[in-house]
Amino acid sequence: MSRLVAELPAQTGTKPERAGRRRRSREERLAYRILVPALGTVFVIVTIPFVLAVWQSITDEDGALVGLRNYTKALGNPLFYDALRATGLYALIVLPSEILLGLAFALLVHRLVKRPALRATLYVLAVLPLVVPPVAVGVVARLIYAPGYGVLNYLLQGAGITHSEILWLGVPILAMGSIASVDIWQWTPFVYLVLFAGLQTVPRESIEAAQVDGATWWTQFRYIELYYLRPLFLLILFFRVADVLRVFDHVFILTGGGPGTSTQLLSLYMYRIEFKFFDGGQAAALAVLVLVAISVLYSLVTRALPLERA
């Protein structure tokens, strides 16, 4: 009998393990219940519209399946490539400008402004352009650049710099620069806020060690601060490229895509296909192609700038 008892497995620890599993199971169920509303919201506002767009892109106006006909029509339209070139030029102007200006301002404030009150004031001022509705921004920009009553021409002529009106919205290259300047004004503060927050995470010990070794400000930025900012550049690039592909409001108000099609960006082109030419299938195909392009671009940028420090 004593031998049989000695050979029985120890029972210690079994009940605590079962209790731990039950506790984890309850926590997992609670987590799932908390996530259900969020997942349901995402499903309603993201998944369902995407599925409907894909369905519309492969059907005609009567709902009959047409395969890839709408995609072929969209890719075969010369105006699509005009819009693609205009969007590419717009991106080449606004993205480098916003990143360089935002980075310069973030470094300037980080190194020269030490008073918390002044930093908070600059933070509030930087947030203001981001909360202004794009339509309001477009209307104000129209008052600045419009011929006849534009404020910019009035100031230039009053200062004697020009003696006749400049058609800021009537010349293709000037019109592109005008709509790009509005985007730069509104979104450079976003870049500044993100990069300034990133600069606050740089270990002070690394900077002090570099200063002791005689490193210049450029060396500190290149080998220390830039290392910590790399994931944030990925974040900025992805969000800004996605926003460039959908920018609409101020371009529609300022130029309407003109002169000609010089400022007709992809979003404005899709709007015209849908609401002017009433070709919902082609517009849906373009929307799906833009979404695929954003996904591919995100994958490429992720490979180039790994998020090991994000």
Language-model regions, residue ranges each:
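Short, Lys/Arg-rich, polar N-terminal cytosolic tail immediately upstream
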Residues: 1-26
